[in-house]
């Protein structure tokens, strides 16, 4: 870097000779810009360009929301433009970007300021470099391209910014428009300077433009956190959080210095150096580079040969960001401050604090500021600065920030550096010197003259020469001067006069000489250095006063063009002085004609720009509407902005909740509500939830809501209701309708109005029902249990959707407390938040589950009939609601519910009625292993197998296990820790007699044990301390400490104890923990029955082998001389029973023969429309008393109808199927006289698919002789329907015409026969050619048969009837086909609707046909049967009268199938290709799937049940369960009694249920205390029939650190307490259940005492069983929702990981207890004495993503150790196909083909091929027409068909796919991937 400036004469330096600018606020010109800076003012304001309230979010957290409503804006109308001046037509001006227009005006002003005329510029080598960044006008026009003006391409093209200037001024140099973002104009300056230096141009104009016309860039910059919230730029201040945007248009004119001097131009400043560079690869593209900025500054100074030390001021980029400002200050410090004197600080400022960041114009804003600073010698303050940045130590640097305006320091050269950075890394720098010092250093002159300058007048010879700049000495004279003014028209001239007068009047002069100088300069400037326009005027004056006066008086002479073109404007007859004539630089610019504005904005764009509301969290932002009173909102839901949505997961997918759609509709309604009235509530009705909106983690979901007045008619508009629809799109391809419905806004009315009174009464009824519901709900449920239950079926609710805090319930009802969900502070407030509303909806689930009945499937809302939401719903953090709900199952897969919520003031907040929820899955738990039926594997059993035959036993289980081997003993001494009993002495003697090789057995008597502990170190010890006696359980402190020393010192322990007494198992439990706490310890236990202890010699052999064996096993038992080891096995049988109990007595399906069943059967509904899973169950109704008016029919046949299909598929809510049957009367009621046993009859009814059917006699009819049972079973429904429609309702008369739709079906064929009988002209529709032929065979004329697949039949009917139509329509079609049929009616016609689709969907009906006096009637025979059975009986009689006289016959064709093929029969109807009727025969001997129902136990209301430890979480749950099972007397024992709030509440609720509760404080480990408690209980309560022992004390600590007291505290309640219960409760019990723990099975670390106690309890259960007493020990695993471990934070270590995947739910424990109690109440018991639960497998751990449990290292658990990979390998091995003959290949199943695949790609291709074939078959199209890139729903796979597809996928691929996956917006490829991932057939390499 040079230390001094180069000063050679003749230079290529570039001068700035003219400028113009327009900035925000008062800075409407360059002079006013300088005034703003000096006065410390700001152009900051709220945005006038768009409605800031529509785009800014005060919370600033939503994407595409503006962080600010403020900026720095031009005061002028940006649409105003002087188009005539530039010769631009209005049409073209309309299309021009205001940046182009303003650039033209500013360019002219800059040329004018430089003294350059249009004439001089024309054809000149002038280059034009214009920098820009944003194009808001272009974006505005592009918002609505259809409305764009003709010249849009030239008007908005960015290149035109430069080209337009070059074109107008006829500039012939380079013309470049450039965009380097915020550095654009300074880069343009650099390029312009280069063009001058290279000689390709002689003049250059540099421009920059930045207008902020739209909101888009505000929002996009906000996305990247660029903008400050208050719209201010706080340059270098610690409070800076971003920059404030600013508008500005500026231009400067450049010339080479030599040329400027030669042309007598103003040299405002000299550009000494420029440079540009790029940041390169930084951490992010918008982050600055310190190194690049340092290089940038150095390059500029090096290029100019400049010294850093001469620079006093640095005009920094200084946007006010915490990332950019510190880096820039550091770069300045590391360049200009190097080797700088410490007393010469660099002053750093930024113009952005005044006018904001003008982006593309920012560089020129800094340049113009710097020019004025150089000229004026003043440094303006940097405003908005108070505290230095903490990231840069300003105080220790040589930098300072000016906080007040001050003069330039010193008198030397004035030099300024200017920085400008682009946000993409394009940087620019310029160095300016003041003109005087520069010219002085070069010995050059300057032609600059400020009109305020008082520079001395050079004396000359008295000649005043016209504008050549020569210096001649003359004498002073009073000669008058001529001033030339011009304009494009008279108005322009007048405006120029006015601005000039205003300017001149601001001048003051110190003497006449300075006034004369000013006048000479003014005359020179106006005459020679300004463009001359066609309207001109000459003013002659000799003084300023005279000049002003003449202008104001318009005293001037018109000037013709000839005169104007001469250089005679300044008279020179008398030359009195010579003055150097200079161009004045501060004269007012040309006065533009801004009377016209040009703004080509469409309505659509304007509505967007001026929208009233911003994007909000639910509905997004308002959109332009396309209809009167239509409103549209659109937004993008991003999980990063709305994280609460992630907490709503259905079947593993994030699904937008139904409550969200309701909340959206309410928010939209709030937007358009009458602001002059108070809203009371929002009412919704007929809300249909359609396709689910699935949200992906990183893909925003587009949501659109439309709202308009509800058009209930096509010729009018009803305004009381608004119809809304919500759509979504997540793949930028397909929009899907998610929800639609109706909403009305209810406003507050006067309290005495009829509406208010009625509403008050209605609310009172709801509140009363709410109160009564709360009173009857006594069963409590923990919210955690509810949410885990919901998660088990696939409704995975996270924190935001877990706001239910209290639950009480009974069958069908619930009462809950719901907290108001409050999102974080950035979210916009809602009338009601979706999470809050969703949790209100969730209260229906406890009502549905009732008294501990689990929820079987994931159910989601599909229809809401009515809802009301109060407008002032509480949403504060502490607010909550109390609600009541009722719910019931309605059909196979639907629930019907309602609920009401009140706030804390007991005011109604939300009510809902007719909430329909539909099942979309079965109960599953994806995080736990399940069998094929979806049941959870929670139970295990402990099995003892021979130690020598382990392998062969376990081969039966198809698993391997650790071998059990024996080896010769080690050559070492073995110590015998000898007990006192004779058994111990005998064993000791026997051991010592054995040949031990080099070692020997050394006995240590018990009495010497304490003194010999040091001899145990590292030894093998055989402990006989508990042979025949108890050492451990009752050990005193010394004995306990001795035990601890034994365990600590010995390396190998073989402990022998009794298996006959339970106390001998204490050491077994402790040893399990010891092995887990000390991995190096070998601690083996041997349990020996008392009878085997006599054979000491054989026992010694066994013990000797165990002492030396390297076996991995540690627990042994000697039984009958056989040594055994234990293994833990899955207990599938118990699992199945528990699952059945948990399913409220669900079925187990077994094949049975119809004749062998021995009881009546009925067809049961399968799950979720699984036609292949239809089964039969016992018909309990057949066992009840036959009513007096009933008959009993032994069914021989039953008819199948399409309604059966709809019920099974879940599309019609019903619990039973089958509506017609035939058979033989088997019994008659006492009042029945018309039938006898043995009569052949048929019946119409409900649930007729059963072997024995009961019906009232009125609905039964004898069948004629000769009519088969199959025929008779097909008569009732179809004929009663046809008869009712045609004869009863339509009142058909002979000669009338009838249109029968779907005429080839059962009803259609029956209707044809009745119509023929009545003599009607028949028109009919069918769907295929075979059906057409069938009708023709039935006598329908060929030209009267039409197609039912489209609406062509309507044209055919009207054509055939010559426009009259038909008299009767029997309709079963829907939608447009119904509408067309309705319009086919003749005058006075009758339309009879027997379909239900349009009724279910609440479709609208055209009213205009009623003008023809038409009648529309709808009915369903089933409803007549239920509601008017007498009428139904009469119809049935009339039908059989027709059949009897052979007027009609049973419907043909008739397809008969055995009842065992009912699934196939239903599927046939589902396909829609059958003709006639289908009947099922009930012949005995058929094989049917029969369910054996498990019945939950019923507890006696005359017995007492004892619950020990009944006030813990699990104890209270069991108490409630017992009450639900019928118990009415409970004795609850606990150490402290019912002291806790929860215990008291539990007792109160039990007593409210009618349960007598005796709560006694009792220590069960104290036999006396327990006996007293039982005596008290016997006095006040019935006999005790059952005991639950759940007492426990936890004292967790490692055994090494455990005290004697801690040992006994844990043992006493379980060991002593359970023994005492055993002693006192020996006989007369229905059950004795011990709640032990799985921790006693594997030996939980730090719980040796607890494990020992648990092992004792297990042994005691076996002991009681051996004595013929009731007993079961349940080793319960971790609880997920209740008990001491209900809160996950209470668990430590691996238990935290195990709880969720392996833990038990409350419903599991209840199911287990139900099973145990039911089994124990039988004699003998059918279950083992010990049941293990809660043990997870390695595979389950792998699926859960956790480490395998450490207990799996124990050989006892080897059968649970199989991983997923091992399981797949085993499966692959077992399923390896044998060689297949070629002729059998075609018979391979899909499973075979998939298993044979060799790669994932092959499997995927195969599955896709099969799926496409299925879709093509469904559509009856060619396979080639199916595009796998499209979602399934695009091929008509709606919710009904989706069920079929799901069932097909399950059957074909063994893959359980959710309905959401089938109806999702994803392409078929994605569905195929899911099938491949879930198929049980697959085991393919990756």
Curated annotation (Swiss-Prot):
Q: Show where the Ketosynthase family 3 (KS3) domain sits.
A: 11-434
Q: Which InterPro entries match?
A: ACP-like_sf, ADH-like_C, ADH-like_N, ADH_Zn_CS, GroES-like_sf, Ketoacyl_synth_AS, Ketoacyl_synth_C, Ketoacyl_synth_N
The annotated pathway is: Mycotoxin biosynthesis
In terms of superkingdom, the source organism counts as: Eukaryota
Q: Where is this region: N-terminal hotdog fold?
A: 616-750
The O-(pantetheine 4'-phosphoryl)serine modification is found at: 1839
Which residues belong to any copy of the Carrier domain?
1802-1879
Q: What ranges does the record give for the region C-terminal hotdog fold, renumbered to this chain?
A: 778-926
| Enoylreductase (ER) domain, as annotated region | 1169-1480
Where are the active-site residues found?
A: 182 (for beta-ketoacyl synthase activity), 317 (for beta-ketoacyl synthase activity), 357 (for beta-ketoacyl synthase activity), 648 (proton acceptor), 838 (proton donor)
Region (Catalytic ketoreductase (KRc) domain) residue spans: 1503-1681
A single Pfam family, by name? KAsynt_C_assoc
Q: Which UniProt keywords apply?
A: Multifunctional enzyme, Oxidoreductase, Phosphopantetheine, Phosphoprotein, Transferase, Virulence
Entry comment, domain topic? Multidomain protein; including a ketosynthase (KS) that catalyzes repeated decarboxylative condensation to elongate the polyketide backbone; a malonyl-CoA:ACP transacylase (MAT) that selects and transfers the extender unit malonyl-CoA; a dehydratase (DH) domain that reduces hydroxyl groups to enoyl groups; an enoylreductase (ER) domain that reduces enoyl groups to alkyl groups; a ketoreductase (KR) domain that catalyzes beta-ketoreduction steps; and an acyl-carrier protein (ACP) that serves as the tether of the growing and completed polyketide via its phosphopantetheinyl arm.
Name the job this protein performs: Highly reducing polyketide synthase; part of the gene cluster that mediates the biosynthesis of the selective antifungal agent ascochitine, an o-quinone methide that plays a possible protective role against other microbial competitors in nature and is considered to be important for pathogenicity of legume-associated Didymella species. The pathway probably begins with the synthesis of a keto-aldehyde intermediate by the ascochitine non-reducing polyketide synthase pksAC from successive condensations of 4 malonyl-CoA units, presumably with a simple acetyl-CoA starter unit.
Q: What is this protein called?
A: Highly reducing polyketide synthase
Q: Which source organism?
A: Didymella fabae (Leaf and pod spot disease fungus)
């Amino acid at each position: 870097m040079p230390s001094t400036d180069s000063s050679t004469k003749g230079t290529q330096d570039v001068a700035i000779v003219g400028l113009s600018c327009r900035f925000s606020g008062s800075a409407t010109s360059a002079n006013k810009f300088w005034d703003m800076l000096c006065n410390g003012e700001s152009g900051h304001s709220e945005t006038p360009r768009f409605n800031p309230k529509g785009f800014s979010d005060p919370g600033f957290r939503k994407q595409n929301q503006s962080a600010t409503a403020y900026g720095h804006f031009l005061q002028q109308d940006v649409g105003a433009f002087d188009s005539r001046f530039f010769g631009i037509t209005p049409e073209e001006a309309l299309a021009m970007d205001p940046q182009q227009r303003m650039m033209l005006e500013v360019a002219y002003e800059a040329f004018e300021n430089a003294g350059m005329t249009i004439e001089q510029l024309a054809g000149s080598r002038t280059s034009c470099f214009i920098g820009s960044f944003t194009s808001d006008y272009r974006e505005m026009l592009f918002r609505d391209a259809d409305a764009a003006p003709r010249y849009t391409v030239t008007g908005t093209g960015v290149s035109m910014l430069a080209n337009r200037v070059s074109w107008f001024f006829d500039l012939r140099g380079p013309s470049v428009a450039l965009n380097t973002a915020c550095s654009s104009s300074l880069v343009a300056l650099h390029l312009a300077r280069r063009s001058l230096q290279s000689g390709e141009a002689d003049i250059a104009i540099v421009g920059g433009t930045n207008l902020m016309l739209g909101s888009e860039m505000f929002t996009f910059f906000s996305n990247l956190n660029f903008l400050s919230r208050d719209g201010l730029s706080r340059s270098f201040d610690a409070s800076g959080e971003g920059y404030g945007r600013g508008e500005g248009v500026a231009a400067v004119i450049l010339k080479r210095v030599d040329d400027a001097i030669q042309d007598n131009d103003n040299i405002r400043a000299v550009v000494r150096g420029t440079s540009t560079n790029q940041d390169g690869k930084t951490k992010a593209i918008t982050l600055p580079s310190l190194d690049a900025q340092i290089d940038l500054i150095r390059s500029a100074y090096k290029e100019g040969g400049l010294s850093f030390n001469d620079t006093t001021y640095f005009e920094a980029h200084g946007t006010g960001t915490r990332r950019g400002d510190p880096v820039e200050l550091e770069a300045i410090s590391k360049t200009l401050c190097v080797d700088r004197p410490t007393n010469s600080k660099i002053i750093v400022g930024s113009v952005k604090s005044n006018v904001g960041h003008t982006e593309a114009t920012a560089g020129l804003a800094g340049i113009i500021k710097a020019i004025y600073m150089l000229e004026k010698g003043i440094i303006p303050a940097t405003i908005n600065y108070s505290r230095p940045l903490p990231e840069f130590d300003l105080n220790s640097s040589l930098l300072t920030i000016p906080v007040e305006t001050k003069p330039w320091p010193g008198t030397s050269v004035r030099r300024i550096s200017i920085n400008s950075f682009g946000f993409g890394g394009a940087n620019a720098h310029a160095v300016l010197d003041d003109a005087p010092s520069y010219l002085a250093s070069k010995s050059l002159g300057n032609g600059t003259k400020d009109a305020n300058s008082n520079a001395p007048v050079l004396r000359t010879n008295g000649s005043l020469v016209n504008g050549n700049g020569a210096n001649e000495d003359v004498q002073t004279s009073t000669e008058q001067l001529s001033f030339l003014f011009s304009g494009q028209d008279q108005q322009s001239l007048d405006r120029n006069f006015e601005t000039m007068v205003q300017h001149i009047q601001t001048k003051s002069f110190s003497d006449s000489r300075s006034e004369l100088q000013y006048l000479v300069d003014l005359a020179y400037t106006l005459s020679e250095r300004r463009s001359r326009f066609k309207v001109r005027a000459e003013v002659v004056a000799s003084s300023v006063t005279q000049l002003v006066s003449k202008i104001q008086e318009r005293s001037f002479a018109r000037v013709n063009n000839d005169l104007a073109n001469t250089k005679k404007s300044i008279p020179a007859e008398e030359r009195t002085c010579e003055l150097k004539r200079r161009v004045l630089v501060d004269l007012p610019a040309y006065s533009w004609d801004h009377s016209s504005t040009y703004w080509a904005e469409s309505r659509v764009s304007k509505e967007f720009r001026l929208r009233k509301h911003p994007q909000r969290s639910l509905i997004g932002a308002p959109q332009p509407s396309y209809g009167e009173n239509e409103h549209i909102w659109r937004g993008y839901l991003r999980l990063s902005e709305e994280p609460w949505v992630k907490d709503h997961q259905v079947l593993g997918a994030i699904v937008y909740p139904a409550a969200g759609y309701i909340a959206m509709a309410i928010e939209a309604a709030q937007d358009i509500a009458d602001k002059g009235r108070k809203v009371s509530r929002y009412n919704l009705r007929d809300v249909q939830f359609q396709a689910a909106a699935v949200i992906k983690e990183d893909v925003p979901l587009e949501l659109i809501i439309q709202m308009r007045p509800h058009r209930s008619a096509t010729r009018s508009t009803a305004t009381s209701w608004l119809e809304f629809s919500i759509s979504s799109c997540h793949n930028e391809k397909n929009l899907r309708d998610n929800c639609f419905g109706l909403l009305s806004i209810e406003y507050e009315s006067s309290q005495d109005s009829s509406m208010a009174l009625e509403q008050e009464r209605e609310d009172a009824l709801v509140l009363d029902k709410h109160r009564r519901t709360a009173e009857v709900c006594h069963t409590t449920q923990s919210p955690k249990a509810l949410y885990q239950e919901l998660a088990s079926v696939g409704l995975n609710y996270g924190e935001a959707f877990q706001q239910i805090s209290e639950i009480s319930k009974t069958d069908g009802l619930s009462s809950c407390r719901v907290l108001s969900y409050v999102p974080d502070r950035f979210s916009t407030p809602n009338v009601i938040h979706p999470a809050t509303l969703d949790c209100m909806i969730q209260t229906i689930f406890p009502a549905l589950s009732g008294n501990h009945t689990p929820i079987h499937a994931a159910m989601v809302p599909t229809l809401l009939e009515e809802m009301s939401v109060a407008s002032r719903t509480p949403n504060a953090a502490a607010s909550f609601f109390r609600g009541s709900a009722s719910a019931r199952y309605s059909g196979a897969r639907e629930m019907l519910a309602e609920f009401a919520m009140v706030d804390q003031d007991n005011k109604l907040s939300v009510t809902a009625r007719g909430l329909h929820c539909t099942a979309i899955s079965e109960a599953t738990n994806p995080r736990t292993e399940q069998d094929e039926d979806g049941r959870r594997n929670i139970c295990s059993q402990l099995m003892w197998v021979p130690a020598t035959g382990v392998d062969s036993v376990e081969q039966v289980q198809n698993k391997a296990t650790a071998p059990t081997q024996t080896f010769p003993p080690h050559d070492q001494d073995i110590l015998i820790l000898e007990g006192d009993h004779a058994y111990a002495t005998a064993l000791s003697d026997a051991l010592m007699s054995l040949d031990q090789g080099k070692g020997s057995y050394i006995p240590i008597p018990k009495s010497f044990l304490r003194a010999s502990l040091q001899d145990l170190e590292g030894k093998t010890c055989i402990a006989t301390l508990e042979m025949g006696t108890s050492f451990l359980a009752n050990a005193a402190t010394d004995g306990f400490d001795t035990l601890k020393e034994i365990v600590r010192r010995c390396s190998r322990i073989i402990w022998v104890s009794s298996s006959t007494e339970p106390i001998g198992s204490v050491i077994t439990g402790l040893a399990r923990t010891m092995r887990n706490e000390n991995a190096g310890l070998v601690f083996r236990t041997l349990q020996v029955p008392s009878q085997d202890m006599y054979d000491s010699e054989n026992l010694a052999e066994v013990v000797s082998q165990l002492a030396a064996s390297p076996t991995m096993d540690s627990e042994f038992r000697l039984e009958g001389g056989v040594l055994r080891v234990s293994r833990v096995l899955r207990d599938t049988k118990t699992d199945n029973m528990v699952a059945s109990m948990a399913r409220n007595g669900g079925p187990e399906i077994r094949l049975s023969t119809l004749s062998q069943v021995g009881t009546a059967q009925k067809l049961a509904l399968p799950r979720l429309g699984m036609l292949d899973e239809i089964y039969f169950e016992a018909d309990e109704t057949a066992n009840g008393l036959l009513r007096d008016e009933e008959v009993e029919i032994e069914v021989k046949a039953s008819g199948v109808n399409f309604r059966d299909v709809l019920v099974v598929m879940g599309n019609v809510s019903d619990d039973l199927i089958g509506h017609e049957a035939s058979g033989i009367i088997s019994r008659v009621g006492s009042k029945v006289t018309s039938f006898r046993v043995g009569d052949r009859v048929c019946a119409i009814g409900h649930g007729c698919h059963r072997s024995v059917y009961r019906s009232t006699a009125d609905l039964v009819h004898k069948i004629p002789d000769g009519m088969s049972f199959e025929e008779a079973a097909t008569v009732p429904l179809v004929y009663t329907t046809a008869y009712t429609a045609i004869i009863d309702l339509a009142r058909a008369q002979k000669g009338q015409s009838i249109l029968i739709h779907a005429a080839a079906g059962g009803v259609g064929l029956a209707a044809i026969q009745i119509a023929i009988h009545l003599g009607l002209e028949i028109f009919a529709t069918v769907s295929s050619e075979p059906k057409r032929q069938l009708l023709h065979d039935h006598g329908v004329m060929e030209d009267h048969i039409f197609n039912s697949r489209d609406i062509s039949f309507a044209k055919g009917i009207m054509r055939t009837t010559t426009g009259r139509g038909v008299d009767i329509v029997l309709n079963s079609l829907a939608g447009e086909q119904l509408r067309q049929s309705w319009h086919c009616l003749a005058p006075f016609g009758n339309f009879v609707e027997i379909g239900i689709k349009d009724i279910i969907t609440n479709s609208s009906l055209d009213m205009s046909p009623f003008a023809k006096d038409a009648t529309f009637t709808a009915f369903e025979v089933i409803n007549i049967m239920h509601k008017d059975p007498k009428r139904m009986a009469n119809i049935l009689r009339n039908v059989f009268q027709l059949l009897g006289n052979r007027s009609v016959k049973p419907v043909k064709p008739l397809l008969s199938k055995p009842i065992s093929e009912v699934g196939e029969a239903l599927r046939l109807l589902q396909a829609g290709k059958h003709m006639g009727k289908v009947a099922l025969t009930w012949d005995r001997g058929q094989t049917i799937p029969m369910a054996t129902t498990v019945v939950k136990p019923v507890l006696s209301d005359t017995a007492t049940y004892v619950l020990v430890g009944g006030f813990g979480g699990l104890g209270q749950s069991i108490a409630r369960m017992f009450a639900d099972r019928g118990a009415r007397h409970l004795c609850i024992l606990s150490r402290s009694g019912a002291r806790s709030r929860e215990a008291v509440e539990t007792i109160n609720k039990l007593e409210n249920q009618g349960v007598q509760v005796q709560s006694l404080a009792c220590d069960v480990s104290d036999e006396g205390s327990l006996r007293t408690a039982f005596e008290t209980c016997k006095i006040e309560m019935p006999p005790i029939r059952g005991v639950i022992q759940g007492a426990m004390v936890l004292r967790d600590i490692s055994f090494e650190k455990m005290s004697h007291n801690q040992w006994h505290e844990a043992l006493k309640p379980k060991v002593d307490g359970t023994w005492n219960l055993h002693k006192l409760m020996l006989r007369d019990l229905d059950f004795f259940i011990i709640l032990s723990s799985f921790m006693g099975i594997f030996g939980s670390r730090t719980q040796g005492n607890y494990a020992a106690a648990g092992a004792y309890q297990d042994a005691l259960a076996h002991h009681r069983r051996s004595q013929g007493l009731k007993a079961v020990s349940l080793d319960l695993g971790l609880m997920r929702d209740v008990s001491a471990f209900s809160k996950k934070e209470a668990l430590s270590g691996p238990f935290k990981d195990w709880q969720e995947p392996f833990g038990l739910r409350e419903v599991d424990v209840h199911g287990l207890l139900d099973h145990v109690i039911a089994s124990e109440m039988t004699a003998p018991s059918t279950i083992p004495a010990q049941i293990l639960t809660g043990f997870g497998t390695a595979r389950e751990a792998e699926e859960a993503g956790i480490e395998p449990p450490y207990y799996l290292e124990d050989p006892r658990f080897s059968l649970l150790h199989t991983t997923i990979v091992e399981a797949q390998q085993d499966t692959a091995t077992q399923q390896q196909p044998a060689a297949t003959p070629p002729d059998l290949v075609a018979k391979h199943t899909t499973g075979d083909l998939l298993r044979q695949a060799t790669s994932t790609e092959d499997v995927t291709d195969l599955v896709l091929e099969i799926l496409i074939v299925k879709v093509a078959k469904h559509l009856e199209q060619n396979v080639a027409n199916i595009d796998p890139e499209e979602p399934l729903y695009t091929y008509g796979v709606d919710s009904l068909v989706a069920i079929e597809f799901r069932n097909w996928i399950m059957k074909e691929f063994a893959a359980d796919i959710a309905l959401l996956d089938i109806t999702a917006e994803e392409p078929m490829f994605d569905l195929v991937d899911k099938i491949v991932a879930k198929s049980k057939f697959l085991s393919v390499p990756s």
